[in-house]
Amino acid sequence: MTIRALNQNIPPWTFAANADEQGPTHPFSSPHPNPNTWAFQPAPNKVGRPGHPYPSPWAAQPRDGDDTNEANHERGEATAPRKPYPYPGPAKGHPPYSFPGAPEARKPYPFPIYAQEPHTYPGPLPWHQPHVYPGPAEDRKPYPSPWVDDDGAKPKPFPRKPYPYPGPAEGHKPYPYPGAIPWRQPYPSPWADDNDDDDDDHKGKPTFPRQPYQPYQFPGAQTHGAGGFPYHQPPDTFPGFQQGGSRGRGWGANGYSARTSFDTPHHPWGFPLLYSNQPPFTFPGVKSDAYQLDVDVFDTPEAFVIHVPLPGAKKEDVEVSWDPKAVQLGISGTIGRPGSEELLKTIALDERRVGAFERKVRLGGPGSAPKVDGEAISAKLEDGVLVVEVPKTEPDDVEVKKVVI
């Protein structure tokens, strides 16, 4: 149902007002069999309870000088509320209440006096007077300004003089400087001599001796032509293996060194790589300052022949040992440069290896250890080459046996 239909079906307000005025006589109103005694019944002196002696405080009452009709409110519609309800007095059987006042032992709280009088600032406390600078003491002049002269006209661009050292405190002796510790001498200057009596400390001459001139050596290159810097290429070896092979030692026809797979790789046009100047590889745990020698081993049916190049070595500085358990030949010693001490100080290029050397060569193949006569080993040093001969007791007859699974 729409709102318009509801408005059409709802009875008008005049109908409801007529029903209220007529009461039970209205045709649409039916009397209740048991009427409510507490129901509000509009009457001049009734509040809603039958027999109440006081008028209702909520009923509209006329104002002073207003002639409105309380029944139908013909003039105006009681725009102002009713006057406040007067106190009816105590209930029946109760005496009127009277304020007893303050008890005799407790006087009323007096109003503070300081709030009645205007507040005035008392000033600082007696023990807290405002500070007044008395000025400098009689025996102490004021601190002068470092930038202004005494007459106040000429400025000074320098600060005041430093405060002098007052000396040690009371009860303390002056600390004498004992000097340098006997076991810790002052570090000498490398640019001045130790003699402090002369006046040549300002010359700046070095106290350490001058080293002989050595041209710069580019790492990992060789000598090309007669001029330029002499580039050095030390040989790189792998310990425990023999160098060379079917191609032999030295330089090949295409211009690069014939090396095995254990050597440092080289460029095919003869220019070695930069990392070819690394020190020889040593296994972990093997630390020795002696360098490895290049050896040639010849295996003949009668003996093993080993050639070791030792240029500049002497017989008394070379030692050859034989280990029968490991079937290993050991060669060690030292190689030095001939000449006087003064000549060795003037060296300008050192490409030859000198110093201690050590090399161990294991004889035989992987099949079995060869049978050699350790008492008949001979060695000789001729033309800078050490020749060691190890004779065999039996010819090599190694047979390969087939194992049946």
UniProtKB/Swiss-Prot annotation:
The family this protein is said to belong to: Belongs to the small heat shock protein (HSP20) family.
Biased composition (Basic and acidic residues): 63-77
Statement: the UniProt record of this protein carries the keyword Zinc-finger: no
Annotated Polar residues bias: 1-11
Key words, A-Z: Stress response
Biotechnological applications listed in the UniProt record: Secalonic acids show unprecedented anticancer activities against various human cancer cells and might be interesting for further derivatization, targeting diseases such as cancer.
Region (Disordered) location: 1-252
Phosphoprotein keyword on record: no
Source organism phylogeny: Eukaryota, Fungi, Dikarya, Ascomycota, Pezizomycotina
Free-text function comment from the UniProt entry: SHSP domain-containing protein; part of the gene cluster that mediates the biosynthesis of the tetrahydroxanthone dimer secalonic acid D. The pathway begins with the synthesis of atrochrysone thioester by the polyketide synthase AacuL. The atrochrysone carboxyl ACP thioesterase AacuM then breaks the thioester bond and releases the atrochrysone carboxylic acid from AacuL. Atrochrysone carboxylic acid is decarboxylated by the decarboxylase AacuI, and oxidized by the anthrone oxygenase AacuG to yield emodin. Emodin is then reduced to emodin hydroquinone by a yet unidentified oxidoreductase.
Positions with biased composition (Gly residues): 242-252
Biased composition (Pro residues): 175-189
Name of the featured protein: SHSP domain-containing protein AacuJ
Organism: Aspergillus aculeatus (strain ATCC 16872 / CBS 172.66 / WB 5094)
UniProt xrefs under Gene3D superfamilies: 2.60.40.790
